[in-house]
């Protein structure tokens, strides 16, 4: 993409206050099931139908009062996925990459995290998401996609 470049986490954290940080997470679980009783499934991946009709990963903008990227991401997960997100937290060890947009406004750094959960945790998130604070506002539904 034009105007987007990969940067290190330390570079991202050194950017000034004119930059906004957004964090998103791929939440997945090994899936021992079989599709139609025959085709082995490998993983279930939690995605959401966003307000604009696109599929995406849960997360959002980090607020200055969050204190860290991970605190902001965990807050966003709780808002979007509901109380089931309180059963786990993402930390710096789950971080994978950062990408910055070069053209203002706004100047945004997108951070991506990956976390393996249990299948029970993924199913609990999927079931509880309609009761989440932001369900219906920022997101339309939660989907557990399999065979990835």
Where are these regions (language model features)?
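N-terminal leader/linker segments that precede catalytic domains of diphosphate-processing enzymes
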Residues: 1-148
